[in-house]
């Protein structure tokens, strides 16, 4: 397993993530304010761009599904599906959306509805409800799947059709990827983005589990118990990944769908 680790990419990613976490922990108040300001700036100034890009991804995926590339077989002309449709759907929902959908599927529309900043002054109950659901559908509907689908298709095509390494840098060509440091930089950025994206979903899920167990008086709701839940979930995920798609992730996904 360790032979497949790329030393440069792993070490640079580890150093940057560790440095970021350390700086944040030693400056919690300043970091909290900075993150809030960045989020507000992105929401206020670039919200239109995010929605435009999401729609662009959706249109592009529809084109790929029905355009001239619709008959392209991932893995080569003789490739056969490795999993049934049922198993694929289970893995997509469990590994793709997971606790994020479980937590925000209900919470997000409610949060949008209660936020006065998102609604025109004097908006009716139905207008607020419709706008709240529209935003939730943008995040958890076809648009989200289109974005995930593009990345998944890129990995599948360049890895299994073009026999390139399973890395984000394999998607690109040109001056940026002609030298090793250009390729490493792209992969490090992708690794950091993935880690923090997973951390967000994991944190939300751990908080939800902690809150539920606290409500049922099974476990005291506290920071320590949240950390313990994160560790348990992380270990389960790690074991699942080490066991591979055919055993770990497949079985865990099937259990999630049943639950």
Regions found by a protein language model. Give the residues of each.
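Hydrophobic alpha-helical transmembrane segments and immediately flanking/interface helices
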Residues: 112-131, 209-227
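Helix-loop-helix module between adjacent transmembrane segments
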Residues: 3-4, 8-11, 15-25, 58-61, ...
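Membrane-interface loop-to-helix entry segments
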Residues: 12, 46, 53, 186-194, ...
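Membrane-core helix-loop-helix motifs of multi-pass transport proteins
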Residues: 34-44, 48, 121-148, 172, ...
């Amino acid at each position: 397993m360790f032979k497949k680790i790329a030393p440069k990419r792993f070490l640079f990613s580890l150093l940057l993530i560790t440095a970021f976490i350390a700086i944040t922990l030693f400056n919690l108040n300043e970091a909290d304010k900075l993150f809030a300001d960045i989020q507000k700036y992105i929401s206020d100034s670039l919200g239109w761009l995010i929605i435009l890009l999401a729609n662009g991804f959706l249109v592009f995926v529809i084109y790929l599904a029905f355009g001239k590339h619709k008959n392209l077989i991932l893995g080569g002309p003789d490739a056969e599906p490795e999993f049934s449709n049922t198993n694929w759907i289970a893995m997509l929902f469990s590994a793709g959306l997971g606790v994020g959908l479980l937590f925000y599927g209900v919470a997000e529309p409610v949060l949008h509805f209660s936020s006065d900043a998102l609604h025109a002054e004097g908006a009716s109950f139905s207008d607020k409800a419709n706008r709240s659901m529209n935003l939730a559908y943008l995040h958890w509907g076809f648009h989200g799947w289109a974005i995930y689908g593009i990345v998944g298709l890129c990995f599948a095509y360049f890895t299994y059709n073009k026999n390139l390494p399973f890395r984000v840098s394999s998607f690109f060509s040109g001056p940026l990827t002609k030298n090793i440091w250009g390729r490493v930089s792209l992969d490090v950025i992708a690794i950091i983005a993935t880690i923090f994206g997973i951390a967000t979903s994991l944190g939300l899920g751990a908080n939800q589990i902690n809150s539920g167990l606290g409500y049922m008086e099974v476990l005291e709701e506290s920071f320590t118990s949240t950390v313990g839940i994160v560790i348990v979930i992380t270990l389960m995920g790690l074991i699942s990944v080490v066991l591979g798609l055919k055993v770990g992730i497949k079985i865990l996904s099937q259990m999630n769908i049943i639950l």
